[in-house]
């Protein structure tokens, strides 16, 4: 089964660190260093959120990309899809 949720990627100002948040999933927060690592961490976080916090993740409804882009206009928004 595949699940997909929008992730917010926010670059730290004086660092390679990228903060990652899934606003639709309570507590789903991580970080990565540079784009490739941040994407890996986002996928890993989404899988872990589904497996470890099954009820919260399963009951969450993914927001649309357009809604997220309005709410987080200064950040990068990417729909992350994983097999669970």
Which residue stretches match the model-derived regions?
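N-terminal segment of the canonical double-stranded RNA-binding domain
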Residues: 1-16, 21
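Short, charged, surface-exposed hinge/linker loops at domain edges
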Residues: 1-5, 40, 44-84
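Generic beta-structure capping elements
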Residues: 12, 23-25, 81-83
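A short, exposed loop/beta-hairpin motif centered on an aromatic-Gly-Thr core
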Residues: 26-37
């Amino acid at each position: 089964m595949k699940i997909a949720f929008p992730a917010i990627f926010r670059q730290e100002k004086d660092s390679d660190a990228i903060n990652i948040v899934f606003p639709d999933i309570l507590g789903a927060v991580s970080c990565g260093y540079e784009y490739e690592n941040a994407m890996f961490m986002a996928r890993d976080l989404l899988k872990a959120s589904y497996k470890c916090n099954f009820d919260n993740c399963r009951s969450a409804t993914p927001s649309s990309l357009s809604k997220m882009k309005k709410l987080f206009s200064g950040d990068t928004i990417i729909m992350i899809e994983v097999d669970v």
